[in-house]
């Protein structure tokens, strides 16, 4: 027996295998954390929920906290709440409760609240939310509140929270709506803010006020400067202030809405332009795009900026770390990229980008078209122009129309330092400790998610930057949100949203702020490794070390105690065996997340399998329809084809076969001549004739006149305008005028019973036949009373109207009354039978021909009407195939 050969693999299967094989390379698995802190540790973390001295909980009936801003000044924490400002001491550390020592109540006055309500705002929105909380000098706090959509600012003593001086307007310094983002900082005694300046939040602005320099702002309502920005952070470095934000990119307007991350800078000493151009506006404002992407043939970008750290020194370079995420309607993912401010400054010295017309794309500006001195530089004494107001108009006009740089700011290593795509909640907050460990030489990054989960990473900036796997180590994952103290029934995820993550390096803790509480969490939980040297050293945590007494201790900077530690990740196989490290990630087990590899593999497999199944299904259905059509054509050909020569017999010539014997004309033997016509007609009838019914009147009584031909088309129906003039016309009991009357020629389309043997020669008209019947010559067939055989639509077809149905009782014809199917006397529809003929069969007619008045010249078919059997019900007029479509 021959062994069957294996069928070659299908192309779809090969494509599926290739895609599945490449998915692992494109989406590498991210390592889980080396350890996960038990959730019961949360019960030991100190929390602030508004408690004051002498009370463990807030007063009964007091409003819940609605924290907006948190500021740490040395060992004091200032918390900006709704209508309140708290001063909390972080020393001495407590393990149960954080309480305020001072409280400032700052409510909106009733008039501001009434105006706010009149503008359509809710009562809960017409409050004073603290949105700006800054240290102005060593003894003064600068605080701004929304004040019921009428922002106001004030100075307060840092020790007593007593007001210092008068209140000032908060316009362009504080947002109207507490939900709007804003940033602010003091530099050289001047306040730099980024917010919106109007009630509708349309006019976004970077604003400088206070100090000894004039007030400046960005150009108003210019999409080249700002397009729906969301301000994230601001830092001071050198002679500039840098603002980090995200906005809709105008240079990608051909791609609909594209959100990109930006960094903009202004000169501290900018005094504005001339009275002709950019008066009281920035002359040094420039912006560039931040590039945080995964390299490859096609870069995968993280465009949504979430958080930025202050300027830190890594390897002697000024660096900021920024958290980026994907858009909310994209694959969830977050990345941490580092940016060197020297590279940022170099980009601002590069090429500009412009759009020559509203319909054109953005292109680089040739260097020969850039005026000198270079636009965007800081004019200062000793330079060609000692002030920005002295700059020529061409330079000022160029700055006004060309604020965007052509190149993007690259991230350090041209790749993210940390990449997480397995998190259900995106990373939105970041804190960095560049002096971690007993020697202060390690860098630890804390990343906070929307739900309060914190991820701790050990970053090695000097390591190879070829990939993210060797650059960072996922040390630990722990929770910071205490639902028993920070939550309330019906609070949902809004109350769990992480507002800020502040590092308190002096006490070795993190300050996690939520809308209703502030939790202080230790940066490490070394005690969970006590009793197991392998776990303590294998954790690679720079905050933990193995002590000689057999415990895992916390190592603060400058620790002099003896300990063992290994942050390089060396093998711990020689350190004994004990309970393994906790590796069950909270983000995987508790949140029930799915691996990106599994997600991509499942999506690709579902697409390929669905495409293959759909293709086979469509092909099968199309083939089935073709096979049915082919079988139908073959059946019709087999019915109409007969004889040796496969000659086609026209149904309109079946009447000629009556005159032929079994052998054809003259008794000749023609192929198929002996086939009775009813046998050929039966398959064509759509209503399923019974053979016995066909043959009950004789096998050769089918008349060619009773089969309509395709050339014939019925005429439209006609109503009877007046009673029929014939004395035997239909009386009052006849059909109404909406039903057609039978024409005289309709008798040629009715099947009548006859004896088994037809006469060889028809008798003369009016003479009796051998069986006692009178023979009447048929008139020529008229097209207005016949139907075509096929139901195909044509412009000349007429609608077929159903006539009233009912049994035809021939016995009642003698009373002279019209019947539901009584023919007009001018054109008898039946052949009169002999006196001894059998009674006619009961007929129920469901369709009729279009009717008209009796035509002149119609002759009676017999001397008098006699009952006969009507076989009209054998024709498929009642079937669906015989119903003509409406005339369009």
UniProtKB/Swiss-Prot annotation:
- Location of region: Disordered: 651-679, 695-742, 757-888
Q: Where are stretches of biased composition, namely Gly residues?
A: 661-674
Q: Does the keyword Transmembrane apply?
A: yes
Gene Ontology CC: plasma membrane
Q: List the disulfide bonds.
A: 116-126, 144-153, 267-378, 292-337, 486-517, 526-544, 532-578, 536-552
Give the Cytoplasmic membrane side ranges. 625-888
Q: In which tissues is it expressed?
A: Expressed in the brain in GABAergic neurons.
Domain Sema residues, every copy: 31-523
Compositional bias of kind Low complexity: 706-717
Q: Which residues lie on this side of the membrane: Extracellular?
A: 26-603
The record lists the membrane-crossing segments as 604-624
Q: What does this protein do?
A: Functions as a cell surface repellent for mossy fibers of developing neurons in the hippocampus where it plays a role in axon guidance. May function through the PLXNA4 receptor expressed by mossy cell axons.
UniProt-recorded name of the protein: Semaphorin-6B
Q: Which organism is it from?
A: Homo sapiens
């Amino acid at each position: 027996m021959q062994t069957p050969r294996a069928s070659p693999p299908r192309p779809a299967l090969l494509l599926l295998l290739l895609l599945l094989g490449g998915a692992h390379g494109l989406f590498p698995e991210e390592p889980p954390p080396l350890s996960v802190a038990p959730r019961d540790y949360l019960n030991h973390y100190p929390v602030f929920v508004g408690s004051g001295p002498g009370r463990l909980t807030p007063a009964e009936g007091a409003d819940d906290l609605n924290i907006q801003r948190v500021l740490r000044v040395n060992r004091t924490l200032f918390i900006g709440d709704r209508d309140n400002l708290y001063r909390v001491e972080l020393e001495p550390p407590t393990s149960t409760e954080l309480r305020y020592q001072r409280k400032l109540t700052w409510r909106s006055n009733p008039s501001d609240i009434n105006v706010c309500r009149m503008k359509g705002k809710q009562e809960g929105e017409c409050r004073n939310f603290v949105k700006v909380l800054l240290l102005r000098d060593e003894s003064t706090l600068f605080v701004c509140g929304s004040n019921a959509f009428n922002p106001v600012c004030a100075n307060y003593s840092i020790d007593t929270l007593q007001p210092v001086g008068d209140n000032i307007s908060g316009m362009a310094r504080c947002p109207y709506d507490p939900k709007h983002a804003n940033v602010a900082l003091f530099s050289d005694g001047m306040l730099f803010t980024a917010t919106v300046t109007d009630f509708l939040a349309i006019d976004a602005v970077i604003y400088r006020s206070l100090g000894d320099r004039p007030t400046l702002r960005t150009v108003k309502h210019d999409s080249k400067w700002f397009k729906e920005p969301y301000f994230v952070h601001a830092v001071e470095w050198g002679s500039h202030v840098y603002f980090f934000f995200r906005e809709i990119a105008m240079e990608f307007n051909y791609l609909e809405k594209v959100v990109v991350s930006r960094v903009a800078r202004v000169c501290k000493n900018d005094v504005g332009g001339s009275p002709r151009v950019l008066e009281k506006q920035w002359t040094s404002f420039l912006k560039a795009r931040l590039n945080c992407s995964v390299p490859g043939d096609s870069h995968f970008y993280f465009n949504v900026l979430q958080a930025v750290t202050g300027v830190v020194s890594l390897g002697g370079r000024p660096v900021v770390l920024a958290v980026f995420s994907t858009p909310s309607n994209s694959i969830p993912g977050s990345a941490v990229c580092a940016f060197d401010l020297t590279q940022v400054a170099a980009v601002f010295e590069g090429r500009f980008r412009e759009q020559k017309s509203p319909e054109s794309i953005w292109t680089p500006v040739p260097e020969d078209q850039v005026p000198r001195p270079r636009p965007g530089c800081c004019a200062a004494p000793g330079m060609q122009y000692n002030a920005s107001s002295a700059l020529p108009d061409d330079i000022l006009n160029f700055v006004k129309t060309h604020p965007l740089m052509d190149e993007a700011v690259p991230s350090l290593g041209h790749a993210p330092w940390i990449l997480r795509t397995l998190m259900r909640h995106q990373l939105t907050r970041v804190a960095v400790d560049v002096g971690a460990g007993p020697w202060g030489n390690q860098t630890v990054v804390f990343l906070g998610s929307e739900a309060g989960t914190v991820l701790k990473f050990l970053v090695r900036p000097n390591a190879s930057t070829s990939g993210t796997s060797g650059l960072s180590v996922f040390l630990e994952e722990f929770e910071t949100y205490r639902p028993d103290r920070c939550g309330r029934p019906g609070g949902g995820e809004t109350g769990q949203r992480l507002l800020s993550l502040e590092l308190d390096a002096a006490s070795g803790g993190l300050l996690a702020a939520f809308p209703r509480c502030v939790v202080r969490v230790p940066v490490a939980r070394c005690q969970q490794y006590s009793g197991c040297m392998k776990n303590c050293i294998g954790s690679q945590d720079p905050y933990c070390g193995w002590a000689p007494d057999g415990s895992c201790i916390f190592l603060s900077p400058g620790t002099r105690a003896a300990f063992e530690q290994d942050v390089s990740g060396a093998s711990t196989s020689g350190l004994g065996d004990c309970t393994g490290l906790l590796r069950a990630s909270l983000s995987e087990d508790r949140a029930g997340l799915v691996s990106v590899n599994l997600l991509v593999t499942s999506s690709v497999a579902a697409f390929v399998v669905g495409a293959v199944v759909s293709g086979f299904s469509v092909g099968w259905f199309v083939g089935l329809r073709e096979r049915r059509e082919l079988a139908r054509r073959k059946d019709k050909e087999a019915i109409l084809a007969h004889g040796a020569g496969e000659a086609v017999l026209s149904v309109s010539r079946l009447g000629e076969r009556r005159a032929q014997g079994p052998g054809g004309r003259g008794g000749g033997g023609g192929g198929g001549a002996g086939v009775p016509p009813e046998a050929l007609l039966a398959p064509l009838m759509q209503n399923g004739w019974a053979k016995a019914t066909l043959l009950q009147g004789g096998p050769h009584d089918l008349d060619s006149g009773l089969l309509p031909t395709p050339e014939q088309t019925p005429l439209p129906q006609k109503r009877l305008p007046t009673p029929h003039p014939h004395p035997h016309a239909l009386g009052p009991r006849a059909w109404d005028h909406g039903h057609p009357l039978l024409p005289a020629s309709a008798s040629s389309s009715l099947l009548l019973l006859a004896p088994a043997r037809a006469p060889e020669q028809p008798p003369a008209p009016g003479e009796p036949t051998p069986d006692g019947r009178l023979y009447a010559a048929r008139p020529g067939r008229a097209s207005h009373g016949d139907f075509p055989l096929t139901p195909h639509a044509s412009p000349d077809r007429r609608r077929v109207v159903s006539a009233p149905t009912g049994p035809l009782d021939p016995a009642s014809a003698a009373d002279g009354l019209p019947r539901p199917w009584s023919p007009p006397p001018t054109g008898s529809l039946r052949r009169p039978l002999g006196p001894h003929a059998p009674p006619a069969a009961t007929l129920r007619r469901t369709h009729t021909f279009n009717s008209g008045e009796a035509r002149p010249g119609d002759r009676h078919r017999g001397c008098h009407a006699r009952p006969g059997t009507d076989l009209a019900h054998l024709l498929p007029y009642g079937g669906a195939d015989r119903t003509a479509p409406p005339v369009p």
